[in-house]
Amino acid sequence: MASVMKSTLLLLAAVFALGLSASAQPTLPSADAVMTQAKTRAAAEHKNILLVFSASWCGPCKMFEAFLDDPKAGPIMNKFFVTARLDVGERPADKLHADSPGAEAPRASLNGAEAGYPFLVMLDPAGKPIVNSFCPASLKCDPAGENIGYPATPPEIAWFMQMLRQAAPALSPKEADALQSWLSQRGRS
């Protein structure tokens, strides 16, 4: 009887511990670790860095991830960029997702503290900003001067393509057309 009770208590303790670990927020690499790895890879591979600030609940972030993961668009982007992702803006009650530790500091230092998601910054291999996703007023993004997030409208796509020309000057016209076409087919007018 004592061994059955002991086994039952051990089983309950294991189930309880498993439940606690399943409900705890995940531990993500720190922003410093993500950026150190991205800079190391970018320098070794002679690429720039595409830094993406996103959140699990963000629909446009998922659309941008689909763009980066697409079999046609992804390889073009990967040819020129090492992608670094930092999760920010997660909801405290969400036990399945967490912010990347320390991600708010680089977001703020890159002038994206008030930007929507995704907030995109293209950096050189040393981590120096080249361009970000704040659309210039001259392109008539709505609203002007704001973060484009996922490039879906013609002005947003135009700005994203200008970002690429600045941060990936070796992007060929054929590659640029393929990316622009991909975004235009999945965007909104």
Question: What annotation goes with each model-predicted range?
Answer:
Residues 136-189:
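Thiol-/selenol-based redox modules, centered on thioredoxin-like
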Residues 49-51, 58, 83, 120:
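Hydrophobic beta-strand anchors of alpha/beta hydrolase catalytic cores
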Residues 1-8:
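Positively charged n-region of N-terminal signal peptides that target proteins for export
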Residues 22-26:
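Boundary at the C-terminal end of the N-terminal hydrophobic targeting segment
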Residues 31-49, 77:
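A short beta-strand-turn-helix
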Residues 8-19:
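Bacterial N-terminal signal peptides
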Residues 70-74, 78-159:
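Thioredoxin-like thiol-disulfide oxidoreductase module
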Residues 53-68:
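Conserved redox-active cysteine motifs that mediate thiol-disulfide chemistry
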